[in-house]
Each structure stands twice: as structure tokens, then as C-alpha cells.
């Protein structure tokens, strides 16, 4: 795109300076071309003079003057150059160059915005990984959309993405689930029962227990083993979770079974390997991981005195199995409640001889629902918390997905139900999707009137000179970079805000200028722009899993 053209131009300018002795070659590749932070500072800005000044020990504005003079000669691309502040060089691009963006959009078509920056790099994204002990909560929902959106953006930048759900079906919480189900089963058949003090509440447990009554009657009344109850509950809850994920448009390439870590001896082998390295000791009938030797503040229990592993041990074993599958990049998406265990797990990975720098852990904050500015708790039959399914029933899949991406992962997310259900321009989802519907409507109207968009390369495109038109072309030009930046930063919120800015610019243009006018040539030029905007916005919505409605 235009930024890369400008970077090539700047590289030539730099090399000319090296060749004629203006500066040394030590600054090669160290300068950047960025969008300016404020309006009125050109279309792009470069720090080349500041970088060279630090290396050459010279005045940055003097060097900026040399750069500006060289760039000013490139009149086919550059319309103007200005030195700003301590030595930034601000560059304004010729309008005709912006018109060339339209050719790039139509040439790439549905692939416009996608790039090869990932170069086929193998990436595993682990997300959701909720225990099969109940329906997905709104907190799980945020993680599900965050993980899926990151995976989609990485795929759009040519990363080979593998989505995995770590299926936590071992340990204490599963036993408690079985005990809770058995208690409800006994209650339903009129037998004596004692509900676990920390048991799982909610109607869903009663529903599972009822299915056992329907299938077995009272035959399980004296069953001493909790396994039949646990297995029935696990199957029912996994089916429920799978249905919720399907509603959200999320699929996984693999569900990794935690129980397999025990059955295949991976837990024991990790303990033995750490023991062989002198990193494990016994104290108070528990097994400790000596993480202080690895730079942590204190040692951690990995096997309790009861013989039950803590979360850290299976997590270390699971990450070892991830590394064995030869991914180039491992991305873990967890709730912020994992913050204490992450350093210990990564220390364990390093201790086992793996490169923990290949692991990126993204922690997200929690979600609160609000109505009329106050936190609310929706009434729920299924559980003692709000489920994702219930939220989808209220706001729909697109709104759910969009709102979950609005904020940085590490920011608390306030989900405003009033805003989410309103059909007004205050609702960001409506605002963006309505922009697409408007674009489609304009194209449909032009078709009915027999007005054909100008062809790419036509001199008619020179009619696109309004400031709002040039601004839209600049935004189109930034579409691939918006995808790439959001993908590599693991930051879907950045792309969402790009789409909101895109929609805002179009709505402003639509309100100020008629696309179809009495001037046929101007109408054709503007329709070419509208066509490119529609295709690009459609691509953007589809890349992050949103629909692009043609009418609203």
C-alpha cells in the first residue's frame, strides 16, 4: 500500500545520503513511517532525521531539511513536505496516489486486507478451556470471543492457526460435580441426601439428575461410586457448552483431555523430571516445586498432602505436550484470576528445557452487565450466574461478539444492555453494520438507475477531490495495516475501533455529499469509491466473524 511505497522512497533517499556522504549507513532500517497523531500534520510522518541525529551526533532539524529536500523532488507521490517539532518530517501525498488505492481494493477483492506477514507460522491459540461443571458464563463468553477473534485475525495474516480447548475433566472440581449430581438424584427419588457444602447449584444439576432418574429409576440409590453421576453430568454439560460455542460461531480443532495427562503418565513424568533436576522436595506431606531457584518469590505446592495435584502441575504437563507438537507460537488466553499461576507454569516449562518465550499469555478482565447505569443480574433458570446463552437471547450473536471486542483484554468490560439492544447510531454495532447496509443501498439504487461505477484507472476518479473523499481513501489504504497490527498485537479491539472510525467517516460523507447527482461523471467516480468501501467493510466484518447485512 501507500505506506510501503513511501518507505521504499525513504529508503532510496537514505541510500542517496549514504552515497553522497550526508550520513553513514548505520541508521539503515531503524527509522519508521507512521500515521501522524494529529490532523494537519500531513498524511505520514517519519522519524528518520531523529534516528540519524542520534547516530551521527548532529542537529535533527538540519538532517530533516536534507531529507525534506530529497523527498520534495518526488512529485509523482509527494505533494508536500514539512519539518515539525524536534525533527519529524511530515509528508503529504498527491491525491492521484490515493486514487490508486481503489485499484488495489478491486484487484484483491475478498482478499483485500489479508497479508502474508505470518508466513505460515504455526500458532496454537488455547482459549475458553472452561471446566465442564456448568454452562458458559458471560466471563467465559468474553474469553471465547477474544480467542476466536485473535485466531481469525492471525489467519487473515497467513498464520497457520490451531484452536484448542483444554478440557479440565480431572481433579477435585469434577468429583464435586459428581457429588452434587448424586445429591440431586437422591433428592428426586425421595431418598436421604446431603448436598456438598461447596456443591454446584443451579437448575442444570437437577435436569442432569432427572435424566439419571429417567434412565435408571432408583437403581443408583445405593451406588457408592460417584463416577456414574460425574460421567452423566460431564456429558450433559459438554453438550451444553458445545451448543453455546456453535451459537457463537466458534469451532475448535481439538479438545485436549486433562484426564489423559494422568492416564498417559505425563503428570508423573513431569514430577520425576523436575525431581531429577533438583527442583522438587517434600514438606508437610506435600510435594513442592522449588520455584525460588528459578527466580520466583516463593516455592509452590504441586501435590497436596491429600495426594491431589494443584492446578500448576497439570498445566506444566499440558504445556510440555503443547511444545512437543512443534508450534512456533503458543498463545494462552486466561481470565485474570490466573495471574498468580502463570509465572510458575512458565518457570516449569523453562525447567523442562523448553523456550518459554514462545508462550504469550493474554489475561482478560471480567464482565459486568449494566442497565440504566446500574449493575444488574438477569434472572436465570440454568445457574446462579448469567450464562452466555441467556445474553445471546437478549442481544443476539453479532452484538455479543462486537461488544466483547470493544475494550482491551486487560480492561474491565461493562456490557451496557440498554445500548446493546438499541437500534440507534449510539449502538456501535448498529452504527458499523448500518454503514454497510447504506453502501449496499446506494449501489442497488445506482443499478436500478443504470449508472455504472467508473472503472479503475479511469480519469473520472480525479473528480474525487473532496476532503471527505480523500480521507476515506486514506482509511481504505490503512485497512491491511489495521488487520496486521491488531493480529500481531493480539488486540481485536484495535480493529473494532478502526471499523468504527471507518463507519463514522462514511456516515459523515453520506450526510454531506450526494453520491448520485445530476453530474453523471461525478456520480460514476463516487460510485467507484462506494463500491470499494462496501467491499472493504464487508471483508472487515467477515474477518472478525460478524455479518455484513445488505439492509437494515
Curated annotation (Swiss-Prot):
Ranges spanned by the short sequence motif 'HIGH' region, renumbered to the chain: 130-140
One Pfam family in the UniProt entry: tRNA-synt_1d
Keywords tagged on the record: Aminoacyl-tRNA synthetase, ATP-binding, Cytoplasm, Ligase, Nucleotide-binding, Protein biosynthesis
Recorded family membership: Belongs to the class-I aminoacyl-tRNA synthetase family.
GO biological processes: arginyl-tRNA aminoacylation
Subunit structure: Monomer.
EC number: 6.1.1.19
HAMAP family: Arg_tRNA_synth
Cell location: Cytoplasm
Catalytic activity from the UniProt record: tRNA(Arg) + L-arginine + ATP = L-arginyl-tRNA(Arg) + AMP + diphosphate
A GO term from the CC aspect: cytoplasm
CDD domains the UniProt entry points to: ArgRS_core
Gene coding for it: argS
GO molecular function, one term: arginine-tRNA ligase activity
The protein, known as: Arginine--tRNA ligase
Amino acid at each position: 500500500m501507500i505506506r510501503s511505497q513511501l518507505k521504499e522512497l525513504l529508503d532510496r533517499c537514505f541510500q542517496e545520503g549514504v552515497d553522497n556522504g550526508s550520513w553513514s549507513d548505520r541508521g539503515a532500517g531503524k527509522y519508521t513511517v507512521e500515521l501522524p497523531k494529529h490532523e494537519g500534520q500531513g498524511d505520514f510522518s517519519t522519524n528518520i532525521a531523529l534516528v540519524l541525529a542520534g547516530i551521527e551526533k548532529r542537529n535533527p532539524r538540519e538532517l530533516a531539511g536534507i531529507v525534506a529536500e530529497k523527498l520534495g523532488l518526488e512529485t509523482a507521490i509527494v505533494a508536500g513536505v514539512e519539518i515539525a517539532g524536534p525533527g519529524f518530517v511530515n509528508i503529504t501525498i498527491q491525491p492521484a496516489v490515493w486514487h490508486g488505492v481503489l485499484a488495489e481494493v478491486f484487484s484483491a477483492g475478498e482478499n483485500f486486507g489479508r497479508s502474508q506477514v505470518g508466513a505460515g507460522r504455526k500458532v496454537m491459540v488455547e482459549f475458553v478451556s472452561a471446566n465442564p461443571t456448568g454452562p458458559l458464563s458471560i466471563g467465559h463468553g468474553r474469553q471465547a470471543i477474544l480467542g476466536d477473534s485473535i485466531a481469525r485475525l492471525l489467519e487473515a495474516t497467513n498464520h497457520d492457526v490451531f484452536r484448542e480447548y483444554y478440557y479440565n475433566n480431572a481433579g477435585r472440581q469434577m468429583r464435586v460435580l459428581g457429588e452434587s449430581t448424586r445429591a440431586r438424584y437422591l433428592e428426586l427419588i425421595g431418598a436421604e441426601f446431603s448436598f456438598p457444602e461447596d456443591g454446584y447449584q443451579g437448575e442444570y444439576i437437577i435436569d442432569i439428575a432427572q435424566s439419571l432418574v429417567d434412565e435408571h429409576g432408583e437403581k443408583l440409590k445405593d451406588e457408592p461410586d460417584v463416577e456414574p453421576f460425574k460421567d452423566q453430568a460431564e456429558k450433559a454439560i459438554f453438550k451444553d457448552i458445545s451448543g453455546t460455542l456453535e451459537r457463537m460461531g466458534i469451532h475448535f480443532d481439538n479438545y485436549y483431555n486433562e484426564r489423559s495427562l494422568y492416564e498417559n503418565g505425563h503428570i508423573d513424568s513431569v514430577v520425576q523430571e523436575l525431581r531429577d533436576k533438583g527442583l522438587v522436595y517434600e514438606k508437610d506431606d506435600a510435594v513442592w516445586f522449588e520455584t525460588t531457584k528459578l527466580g520466583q518469590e516463593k516455592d509452590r505446592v504441586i501435590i497436596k498432602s491429600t495426594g491431589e495435584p494443584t492446578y500448576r502441575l497439570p498445566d506444566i504437563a499440558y504445556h510440555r505436550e503443547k511444545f512437543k507438537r512443534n508450534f512456533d507460537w503458543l498463545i494462552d488466553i486466561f481470565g485474570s484470576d490466573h495471574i498468580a499461576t502463570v509465572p510458575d507454569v512458565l518457570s516449569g516449562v523453562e525447567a523442562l528445557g523448553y523456550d518459554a518465550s514462545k508462550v504469550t499469555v493474554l489475561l482478560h478482565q471480567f464482565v459486568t452487565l449494566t442497565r440504566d447505569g446500574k449493575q444488574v443480574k438477569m434472572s436465570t433458570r440454568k445457574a446462579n450466574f448469567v450464562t452466555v446463552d441467556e445474553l445471546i437471547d437478549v442481544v443476539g450473536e453479532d452484538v455479543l461478539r462486537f461488544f466483547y471486542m470493544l475494550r482491551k483484554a486487560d480492561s474491565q468490560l461493562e456490557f451496557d444492555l440498554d445500548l446493546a439492544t438499541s437500534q440507534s447510531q449510539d449502538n456501535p454495532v448498529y452504527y458499523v453494520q448500518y454503514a454497510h447496509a447504506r453502501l449496499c443501498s446506494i449501489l442497488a439504487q445506482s443499478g436500478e438507475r443504470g449508472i455504472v461505477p467508473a472503472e479503475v484507472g479511469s480519469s473520472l476518479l480525479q473528480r474525487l477531490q473532496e476532503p471527505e473523499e480523500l480521507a476515506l481513501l486514506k482509511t481504505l489504504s490503512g485497512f491491511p495495516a489495521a488487520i496486521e497490527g491488531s493480529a500481531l498485537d493480539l488486540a481485536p479491539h484495535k480493529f473494532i475501533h478502526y471499523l468504527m472510525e471507518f463507519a463514522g467517516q462514511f456516515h459523515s460523507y453520506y450526510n454531506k455529499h450526494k453520491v448520485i447527482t445530476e453530474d453523471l461523471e461525478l456520480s460514476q467516480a463516487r460510485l467507484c469509491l462506494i463500491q470499494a468501501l462496501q467491499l472493504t467493510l464487508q471483508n472487515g466484518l467477515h474477518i472478525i466473524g460478524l455479518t455484513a447485512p445488505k439492509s437494515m
